[in-house]
């Protein structure tokens, strides 16, 4: 009995920290296991001649263990870097496992294809756009909803007050009757009304009225204008007389004395 058989007998019938037993079978958690199953051919501890595939930082390596390096645990595994080209990598596997068992060669190739496939998927997912999920605090969300509803109610009330003020201003309602309202809304409505009135006055000043009359009407208008001018002059003279009354002259009487 060689050493591999002794190791397997101990692992199989005693205890192994890598074995996982289920209802359907037994599995191995050792990273060097080429198949992931717990059996005589797949066990990396009970086989002095063994090979597997591993991935490190996106690069695929072939790890080979041979009986000559078993006494040296630090040099037990030989690491061989495989090329990115699939055909060249398969050629490397055949060269290093030239006289090995066909079963281990086929399992190494299958593991190589699986590793190469999931590396492709990783690169594709890294380049694709992914959704980022963020947790939501329900308490904060409810508080924000309440604030939004309150802000909408306040805005609706301000709009109603502004409309009421505009209606009262149009109806010439006294501002003294308005109590307990927002003063800014009242001032805003009042400014809007003043701007509208100023624009209307400017528009009326710019307009020119044209009136068509007959010849007799023109003469009558001229006579009326002359009469108005004369009456204005008389009123001005009368005002001057009233405002500046002439002072009475003083009269002194001298009597002659008889000698």
From Swiss-Prot:
A motif (Nuclear localization signal) lies at residues 245-251. The modification Phosphoserine is found at residues 199, 231. Residues 97-150 are annotated as: Nucleolar localization/retention signal. Pfam families: Mak16 (PF04874), Ribosomal_L28e (PF01778). Residues 195-215 are annotated as: Disordered. Its main location: nucleus. It is found in: Nucleus, Nucleolus. It comes from the Eukaryota. Belongs to the MAK16 family. Involved in biogenesis of the 60S ribosomal subunit. This is Protein MAK16 homolog. The gene is MAK16.
């Amino acid at each position: 009995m060689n050493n591999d058989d002794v190791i397997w007998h101990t692992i199989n019938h005693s205890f192994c920290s890598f074995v996982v037993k289920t209802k359907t079978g037994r599995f191995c958690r050792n990273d060097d296991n080429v198949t992931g199953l717990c059996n005589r051919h797949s066990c990396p501890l009970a086989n002095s001649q063994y090979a597997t595939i591993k991935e490190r930082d996106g690069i695929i390596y072939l790890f080979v263990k041979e009986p000559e390096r078993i006494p040296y645990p630090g040099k037990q595994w030989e690491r061989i870097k495989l090329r990115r080209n699939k055909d060249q990598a398969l050629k490397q596997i055949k060269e290093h496992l030239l006289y090995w068992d066909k079963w281990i060669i086929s399992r190494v190739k299958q593991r190589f294809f699986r590793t190469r496939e999931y590396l492709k998927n990783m690169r594709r997912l890294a380049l694709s756009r992914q959704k980022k999920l963020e947790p939501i605090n329900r308490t904060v969300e409810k508080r924000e909803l309440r604030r939004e509803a309150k802000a909408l109610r306040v805005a609706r009330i301000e709009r109603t007050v502004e409309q009421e003020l505009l209606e009262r201003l149009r109806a010439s309602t006294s501002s003294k009757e308005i109590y307990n309202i927002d003063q800014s809304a009242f001032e805003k409505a009042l400014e809007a009304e003043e701007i509208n009135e100023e624009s209307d006055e400017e528009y009326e000043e710019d307009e020119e009225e044209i009136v068509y009359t007959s010849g007799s009407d023109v003469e009558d208008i001229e006579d009326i204008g002359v009469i108005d001018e004369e009456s204005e002059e008389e009123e001005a003279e009368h005002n001057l007389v009233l405002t500046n009354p002439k002072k009475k002259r003083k009269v002194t009487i001298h009597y002659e004395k008889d000698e």
